[in-house]
């Protein structure tokens, strides 16, 4: 995306460049090339993205949601990160020197990928098995948007979780491929983490940073380094940390203690298990463990039974902010303009201080307000005791594309030396989640996903799986997108939007762009009962699927939605006959609306089963609209809207507006879409 932004702002505003800018283009193109029909998403956690992608792939397989997953990361060298790190004075004028001189990073580029597969599936097709993925750990620092916690707490939380989820102990790890960026703060925190966890427990641990050879490949780093770690294990060879001079070795010996940092030359050693660590802007930490011989260690991932419930709703919409304003707008049948806003009253209500929120870009402000609103609405107090037992999945369609384009536009005019250290941190997609972690104190699972509008529903599905795995008691799942001048301009250039008001099923060629941020607090029913929370509804099933079509289109992808619905029904152990209503994604653009009605008609008699749409009042808010569908459904099932609610029923070849009795609803299906053919379906129950 970065290279496309360069061309767009420095050469000509070509619409084809705009289509290549979103991170979601990457996974969609890969899915189309390899024919993937299951879960397709992009993990957008900056330098930890590749590692988290492999972890999520393994989770999906263990949950029975996939047999084979292509997982990895890619990043191309471009002006925005170069100028940004230059503005932070974080680039070493020489080659980077991790765990040595630590004067700064050297930027690299590349891609890494692994095929993650169930053992049974791999055996059945006679595949070569390199290793087993045992377990992973993911956490948030809740500290600073660019710097790690000096005490290494977040890093150690992720590392310990990976060891625990792998069913192993510290002594079982033979080699750690460290994050090792070559910056002083990162290297010092990682030194501390490794010593704290392994000293006195593992006397023969090898550690190295392969970034000394590749440079920092940013979003690709975790995946590339996972491949390094796996190959190290396969070949029983520890890759070196290069760049040490003779006079550096004594300093290293003093700092390393019994940890072997393998300076300058590789080391032959029997390696049975390896750990790969990745840490990122936003305070995101990820650790994953691979084992050479499958079956020698048992993964300790547990699957928690019982219901998952919605206990809090945070809402920032063009109709106003907070649940009360949204309900009032629904009762009064109000529509809105296309832009959400937050200001001093919102920050004060959520106890956000000016010293904090003035640092945030608009997208992150929307997310901070809605996230804190969900905690407030759910009566959930984050404390030191429970901060690690609650996490978040941030879903976004365009994410930080607006701030990134703004940064690129600035340096296209001023040159790479004209970048802003203040603005640069907001160009990573996981900035909004990082800021929410900081202001809320949440230190648990922290992942940002991006793949079109359905990201706001995919976040709910992902959060459900994290809770089912037993890794967190509670999760905030969000959908957040902004309608800035930059984003609106990109959509106009693609001839997808109009300034006119467009209603669902109008058969237009365009839609009305809007924005917002919706945060949904999910937790186990046991957790909710223990603290006396009053749930809105239960979330009983999810499904995700993909039917590849050219990125930027949806035409011909209805099979993907049908497969997602089928998977959600199976997951919830229910049937189409039990569904009382559907909250759909129609936005007035006939290409989108047709795929929805085509797939829904395969399961439901749409002359009887109503289709409700939140976009009637708020427009196409993308990920925000998808998450709003869940929030709206939760309010209906909870009884906050006991009177009639507007919906659509099929009348011949048309979908016509009508009213349905909200009080009679017991089970609701929520669906959403993405350009390229990705779909998510979630089932809510009273």
Regions found by a protein language model. Name each.
Residues 12-14, 25, 52-55, 59, ...:
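Glycine-/small-residue-rich "gating" segment that lines the acyl/pantetheine channel
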Residues 24-27, 53, 117-119, 151-167, ...:
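Short, well-ordered amphipathic alpha-helical segments that serve as non-catalytic structural scaffolds
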Residues 166-172, 198-203, 255-311, 383-387, ...:
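Flexible, low-complexity linker/loop segments at domain and module junctions
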Residues 23-26, 34, 40-73, 106-127, ...:
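Active-site-proximal alpha-helical scaffold in enzymes
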Residues 95-166, 175, 295-340, 495-574, ...:
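Condensing-enzyme catalytic core mediating Claisen C-C bond formation in acyl metabolism
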Residues 65-103, 136-150, 178-188, 202-259, ...:
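Acyl-CoA/ACP chain-elongation machinery
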Residues 2-9, 15-56, 65, 81-83, ...:
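Conserved catalytic cysteine-centered active-site region
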Residues 1, 158-170, 324-393, 400-401, ...:
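Conserved active-site "lid/cap" helical segment
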